[in-house]
């Protein structure tokens, strides 16, 4: 089992790092008391090999030896990787002023500045023990995400899940679509008597549509459009992209185009899914 511990000063980006880990398949727990780690890992045994835990100052031991004792209780086969995120006092002050959130150490007689400085002193011994120390003072959330991903994977590239979905306009447009293409202008197999009861997954319909120059040109142009912009979408920290293809009833043209695009992109590095919404109505 691989365990990633994320600690650091409040406001430095721990929640951002945890979201990256969640996208990478980690079972994530926010602000778990260290004494509960052993129990959590025992419960997750056989269910998840990737676990990430964020710990804030309220759950951290006051001495290094206490932390070492807690980690020593974990199963021997646990691979531990640790992060410490930090920012300058001025940056943290600005972030808290903008969000107007309450600092974990804020009390009636303690100012925000004093709470930030106190947290830094309390966490300083822990900061010296971690595998990766990240100063987020000059990083935005995308740059921090890339940095965490690069440490874990050796690359900033993100596995983008591309979901191609066919649908029929007569049943309504999918609300989750990022891109939507209308293929009702393409030659319609519905008007061929022998093709009408079939779908775009059946060979006779595929042969009919593959012989239409307009269909082939449309698929080629959509492929080029997506190939051009996918790298930019990935750098924008997207986890998935839904591309909807619609025709009148969602039986022939949209199903065929969706199927062909899914096959084309399956040859690349992306994880591709294909779904035919209206075929489930049968």
Curated annotation (Swiss-Prot):
Keywords: ATP-binding, GTP-binding, Nucleotide-binding. Pfam families: PapZ_C, RapZ-like_N. GTP binds at residues 56-59. The keyword GTP-binding applies. The keyword Transport does not apply. ATP binds at residues 8-15. InterPro entries: P-loop_NTPase, RapZ-like, RapZ-like_N, RapZ_C. Displays ATPase and GTPase activities. This is Nucleotide-binding protein Shew_3314. SUPFAM superfamilies: P-loop containing nucleoside triphosphate hydrolases. GO terms for molecular function: ATP binding; GTP binding. It comes from the Bacteria. It comes from Shewanella loihica (strain ATCC BAA-1088 / PV-4). NCBIfam families: PRK05416.1.
């Amino acid at each position: 089992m691989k365990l990633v511990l994320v600690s650091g000063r409040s406001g430095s980006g721990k929640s951002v790092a945890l979201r990256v880990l969640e996208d990478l398949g980690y079972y994530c727990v926010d602000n778990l008391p260290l004494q509960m780690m052993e129990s959590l890992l025992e419960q997750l045994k056989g269910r998840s090999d990737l676990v990430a835990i964020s710990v804030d100052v309220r759950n951290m031991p006051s001495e290094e030896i206490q932390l070492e004792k807690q980690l020593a209780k974990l199963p021997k086969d646990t691979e531990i990787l640790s992060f410490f995120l930090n920012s300058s006092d001025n940056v943290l002050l600005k972030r808290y002023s903008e969000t107007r959130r309450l600092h974990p150490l804020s009390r009636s007689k303690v100012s925000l500045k004093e709470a930030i400085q106190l947290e830094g002193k309390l966490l300083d011994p822990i900061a010296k023990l971690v595998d990766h120390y990240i100063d987020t003072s000059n990083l935005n959330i995308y740059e921090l995400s890339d940095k965490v991903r690069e440490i874990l994977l050796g690359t900033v590239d993100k596995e983008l899940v591309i979901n191609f979905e066919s649908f029929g306009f007569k049943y309504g447009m999918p609300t989750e679509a990022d891109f939507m293409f209308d293929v009702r202008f393409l030659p319609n197999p519905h008007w061929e008597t022998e093709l009408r009861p079939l779908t775009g997954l059946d060979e006779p319909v595929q042969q009919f549509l593959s012989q239409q120059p307009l269909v082939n040109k449309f698929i080629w142009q959509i492929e080029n459009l997506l190939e051009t912009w996918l790298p930019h979408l990935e750098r924008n920290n997207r986890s998935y992209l839904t591309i909807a293809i619609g025709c009148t009833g969602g039986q022939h043209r949209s199903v065929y185009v969706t199927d062909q695009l899914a096959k084309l992109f399956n040859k690349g590095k992306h994880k591709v899914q294909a779904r035919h919404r209206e075929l489930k109505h049968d």
